Amino acid sequence: MNAQVGATASHRENPHHSRWTFGCACHSSRRQFLAGAAAFGATAVLPDKKAKAQPAAPKLIDTHHHFYPPAYQRRQIDWEDQRKVPHFGVQSAWNPDGDLEAMDKNGISTSMLSLASTPGVWFDDGAENAHDMARLCCDFAAEMVRDKSGRYGLFAPLSMLDTDATLKEIEYAFDTLKADGINLQTNYGDKWLGHPSYRPVLEELNRRKAVIFVHPLVANCCANLSVGTFPAVIEVPHDTTRTVVSLLLSGTFAKLRDISWLFSHGGGTIPFLAGRIEAFYDQKARGPNGFAPDGIEAEFRRLYYDTANATHPAAMAALTKLVPTSQITYGTDYPYFPLDQIENLRKLGLPPADLAAIANGNMTRLIPRLSA
């Protein structure tokens, strides 16, 4: 990420999303920003022209790949301008043609589309509007999936503000749009995914044997704990850990066994903190009525983790000590990070079978249609 990227706090009435929006350190006016968006996108969104295409084998499936419909981009610019929050250029300059060109240049066969942005689909304008924005984003991504056969899959974003409306969103995503899975945030305001209010939604997703991709946002509680850094550097991976622990301690993992969970950025800090969490809770967790019947580490080993911005040798060493490579998928966090992170994995000297499993095999096992 560009070293000039910064973050600005903004006052919000909405209790269901983070207090922070991230952007470049220099705040541009709406007119200046829109005038320069296309030029910015050409340099920031697309990869270096000197980058070489990746080899065809192994096939690459990017499981952590973001999209932003034009209507969403415009709404976010308005929302940020109202709060004097700087714009995040690569997000607002994203477009489908540039996305596909970048995939081609970097050997990405298929990308799983998901939404990742503060404030999600709720722009402080009511649950109904959030529901409508979720529908708009799902429709846009589903059209990309249809128009570019085989190049995209869809993790459908949900609003999560009203249980009945969210259940209808799930029905529409799976039954009408044929989504491949669901895209959730780690937190919605001051509630993480293990909160009891989300149990009816998760029970329905369990009934459908859904794949859930979970993307972190900086939580309300912790936006001011960044010790002078861009908040995403520290707080984003920690919020993945918070929501994983909330799902663990609430018994959600133990009770809803038919959900396949995919967590971002190598699981945040879970690989490093697994032993500490186990030391505090493992004895009370075990047993047929416990929240981790076979032990906490066994619960963590059932989850899936992507490699987005987590391909450093130390990070991968921790992750592969905790889980087998069968639980790891390739991800990039594009357009915020480059698409060529497979090179870092190649340098680790993984056995070819393990590299192929991460690159595509594990994801095609989760979503068989991607093997076509």
Per-region residue spans from a language model:
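Mid-to-C-terminal alpha-helical segments outside catalytic/metal-binding sites
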Residues: 2-48, 56-59, 63, 69-110, ...
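Active-site environment of divalent metal-dependent phosphoester hydrolases
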Residues: 68-70, 119-121, 161-162, 190, ...
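Active-site-adjacent C-terminal substructures of enzyme catalytic domains
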Residues: 237-241, 254-258, 282-283, 288-339
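Generic enzyme active-site microenvironment
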Residues: 213, 263, 331
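Active-site gating/metal-coordination segments in enzymes
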Residues: 109, 114-250
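Histidine-centered divalent metal-coordination motifs
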Residues: 64-66, 215, 265
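Active-site gating loops and adjacent loop-to-helix segments of metal-dependent hydrolytic enzymes
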Residues: 69-94, 123-131, 219-240, 277-302
